[in-house]
């Protein structure tokens, strides 16, 4: 899910919105980090333009004309949530529905497992804001440096999230209102994918903190959704611990990753393949005429 966030106007990231478009284009040409990793596991990467702000990349190519991108743009990025709601309720619903539609499309193509991923400058700010509001905790506990901020930048990021929560009284708001007020199109799309997993009975492998935030919102909106979700890795962002505790999940990989794009989720694919191979073809103790061990734990 590729989308931009209006909150970048507040200097919460060292990168500009042009980076979102450039990385999405690299995904379309199968050159990005997640594409290289997915190729190793035999997975297909589907970059979705659900809200990229820039219309062109430095080469002059237009995002809307690019092959290899699923064009589902709702708007050219969200609004600056410090000044107004990030998106309208209608836009938020459309983003959620888009995520569900993508899972349906994958199901109809015979795909049997899906990994989530996202690309969008400023989305660690939106995800931290959603996490703090839904968990009703101090933003300091769930807000990290994202793609890279100074201590001063981190403090500003935490302060503006706290300001938005106070301004919109989000500790008392329902998850959908929180999502539409301070979230992003990418997060809303991922919420839809989580829900779609339950609807179409497809396991969804969650990537990092942003996917986990989407999973929490999905579970709050539609209890039971999490039964179709598999956590992949524990990244650097501080929100991960609280989110996993709330969802009662335990990520398999602890690599302190912060690469994004869905790379952590794709890494789990390889481990799942190995586990499945062992499950289906591995020799049992009885098959080797070895006495079964007693279980003490």
Residue ranges and their predicted role:
Residues 1-297:
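N-terminal loops that bind phosphate or other acidic moieties
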């Amino acid at each position: 899910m590729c989308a931009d966030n209006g909150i970048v106007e507040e200097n919460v990231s060292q990168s500009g919105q042009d980076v979102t478009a450039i990385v999405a284009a690299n995904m379309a040409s199968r050159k990005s980090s997640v594409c290289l990793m997915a190729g190793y596991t035999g997975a297909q990467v589907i970059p979705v333009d659900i809200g990229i702000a820039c219309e062109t990349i430095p080469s002059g190519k237009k995002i809307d004309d690019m092959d290899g991108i699923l064009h589902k743009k709702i708007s050219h990025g969200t609004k600056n949530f410090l000044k107004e709601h990030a998106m309208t309720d209608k836009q938020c619903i459309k983003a959620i529905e888009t995520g569900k539609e993508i899972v349906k499309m994958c199901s109809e193509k015979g795909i049997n497992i899906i990994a989530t991923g996202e690309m969008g400058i400023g989305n660690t700010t939106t995800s931290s804001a959603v996490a703090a509001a839904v968990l009703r905790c101090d933003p300091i506990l769930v807000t990290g440096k994202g793609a890279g901020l100074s201590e001063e930048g981190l403090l500003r990021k935490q302060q503006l999230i706290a300001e938005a929560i106070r301004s919109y009284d989000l500790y008392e708001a329902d998850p959908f209102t929180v999502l539409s007020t301070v979230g992003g199109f990418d997060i809303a799309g991922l919420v839809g994918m989580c829900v779609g997993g339950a609807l179409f009975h497809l396991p969804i492998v969650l990537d990092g903190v942003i996917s986990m935030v989407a999973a929490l919102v999905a579970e709050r909106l539609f209890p039971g959704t999490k039964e179709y979700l598999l956590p992949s890795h524990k990244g650097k962002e501080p929100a991960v611990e609280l989110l996993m505790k709330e969802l009662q999940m335990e990520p398999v990989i602890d690599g302190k990753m912060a690469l994004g794009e869905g790379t952590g989720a794709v890494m789990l694919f390889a481990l799942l393949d190995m586990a499945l191979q062992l499950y289906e073809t591995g020799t049992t103790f009885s098959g080797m005429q070895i006495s079964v061990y007693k279980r003490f734990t």
